[in-house]
Amino acid sequence: MIQHIRNFSIIAHIDHGKSTLADRIIQFCGGLSDREMEDQVLDSMDLERERGITIKAQTAALHYQAKDGKNYLLNLIDTPGHVDFSYEVSRSLSACEGALLVVDASQGVEAQTVANCYTAIEQGVEVIPVLNKIDLPAADPDRVIAEVEDIIGIEAKGALRISAKTGEGVDQVLEMIVAQIPPPEGDVDAPLKALIIDSWFDSYVGVVMLVRVVDGVLRPGNKILLMSSKANYLCEEVGVFQPKAVSHKSLSAGEVGFIISGIKDLKSAKVGDTVTLADRPAGEPLAGFKEIKPQVFAGLYPVESNQYDALRAALEKLQLNDASLHFEPETSQALGFGFRCGFLGLLHLDIVQERLEREYDMDLITTAPTVVYQVVLRDGKITEIENPSRLPDLSSIEEIREPIITATILVPEEYVGTVMTLCTGKRGIQKNMQYMGRQVMLVYEMPLNEVVMDFFDRLKSVSRGYASLDYEFKEFRAADLVKLDILINSDRVDALSLIVHRASSQHRGRELAQKMRELIPRQMFDIAVQAAIGAHIVARENVKALRKNVLAKCYGGDITRKRKLLEKQKAGKKRMKRVGNVEIPQAAFLAILQVDGK
């Protein structure tokens, strides 16, 4: 039986047609009836459908009768394409022996295509190149085949030419999967070993674990042991997704399916853990995945302070399905009680915020995203700081190190100049530049905090949307960094603090103060907005008070009478300023992102 199993995933850049091809394959194999079929059938979240992106990996077990007359079981594992979710891709690939590399025949190879393909090759997966969208008038398959060979370096002469939209060539893809992807290796009689690829929480049955069985057989009623936590559970149900969940009598070596065993806490079923039988455990656990560390941090605060507990509950529920989301409570003088949350990137932050607002009906204030800095103190201690307002006193700091990433940018040659200017402006150091057909591959080392700000949007705008970016963390490196504070009426607003490079700090301070002046609504008293580095004020702007014309009722009359009224108004404003609070709108917290550190 194991000879007739094929485990494969589909890897591609965003918008190259992964989910559409998955739909066609499911339809072709009869996984869903025409009535149940809908676009992006594996994208189960509404958010995934609306944005046209895949966030969570999904699976489908399909039966296919090949032209040689044999019946095959195809396990399709769908993967995300966005750089923020690249860890999901490596998890999906670890359960496969093969991968379809889908490339848009009009767009050509893009940065995530390269990154995901290298991940597949590193994991020893058989890669089958597929050119999609050949029905488009702009399709140029010959150029794209040359690009695949030049940039990625895999043989692509015999690449399949298909159109997932119309279904043309899908049957050839299935035949290619059967012919080229090797069957899984595994021993049905050995002790059970199953790798947890994903786990999520279901309110009816508890935690559902998606596993790839490597050796052995698992049946409902078996006692299972999770090897990292040494916890025992009773296996209640096993089965596969076709894409709807279907219960089976057993899961055996080579198969991909789900296990339900009444686990209440997602932390117990860690992704990358090995499941084995309690009464006949495996000797060694399988090689898991490296822990994913959040790259970007932001504060999430409820607009109403009585919503704090509801926000905690909502974050805990989201964390059940998204192990890469980290959060811890924090307080801010300006915003009250909230949470410091860690994300994989800006898209991840955006999606979490939108899910909180949409699914849990929360009203949130989000502070500008920051990255983790390493601070070396004079006594030799090293601490990691993800909130700029927690930076220790400058006199006790030896050096501040910022995270550096290696960014790979693929861009058509006519936009190379503007992209290089942008990277240099973001303190990038060029490491490599290769011409590949009509595209150029640029490799830069850049500080992550420059990328987090607005790099992605600016890259798209200077290249008219053609450039694509992939990055990975390299190291922490010492830099000349300072903390920029914003003072409103001489009070520091901790949520507006940020860490910037000294060279651009004055400019950033001036721009930020100007931006604040525009965004803070006028009150009945003057508001002073100042930008400060330590005790040194680098910029000041005033938000002028709204004032009533107190002289309106004086027709002519004595100047002293007018002066008395004006003095009285001035004294009232002064008193008001002493007790008055300034409401800072949400837009002001995100203004940091729009300020350009030139």
Curated annotation (Swiss-Prot):
The enzyme's E.C. designation: 3.6.5.n1
Bilayer topology annotation: Peripheral membrane protein
CDD domains registered for this protein in UniProt: EF4_III, LepA, lepA_C
Subcellular localization(s) per the UniProt record: Cell inner membrane
UniProt-listed GO biological process terms: positive regulation of translation
Entries under InterPro entries matching the protein: EF-4, EFG_II, EFG_III/V, EFG_V-like, EFTu-like_2, G_TR_CS, LepA_C_sf, LepA_CTD
Origin superkingdom: Bacteria
GO cellular component, one term: plasma membrane
SMART domains: EFG_C
Main subcellular localisation: membrane
Pfam families found in the cross-reference section: EFG_C, EFG_III, GTP_EFTU, GTP_EFTU_D2, LepA_C
Residues bound to GTP: D15, H16, G17, K18, S19, T20, N132, K133, I134, D135
Keyword annotations of the record: Cell inner membrane, Cell membrane, GTP-binding, Hydrolase, Membrane, Nucleotide-binding, Protein biosynthesis
Domain tr-type G: 3-185
Group of enzyme by EC: hydrolase
Catalytic reaction annotation: GTP + H2O = GDP + phosphate + H(+)
GO molecular function, one term: translation elongation factor activity
Function: Required for accurate and efficient protein synthesis under certain stress conditions. May act as a fidelity factor of the translation reaction, by catalyzing a one-codon backward translocation of tRNAs on improperly translocated ribosomes. Back-translocation proceeds from a post-translocation (POST) complex to a pre-translocation (PRE) complex, thus giving elongation factor G a second chance to translocate the tRNAs correctly. Binds to ribosomes in a GTP-dependent manner.
UniProt cross-references to NCBIfam families, sorted A to Z: lepA, small_GTP
Family the entry assigns: Belongs to the TRAFAC class translation factor GTPase superfamily. Classic translation factor GTPase family. LepA subfamily.
Name of the molecule in the record: Elongation factor 4
Annotated source species: Nitrosomonas europaea (strain ATCC 19718 / CIP 103999 / KCTC 2705 / NBRC 14298)
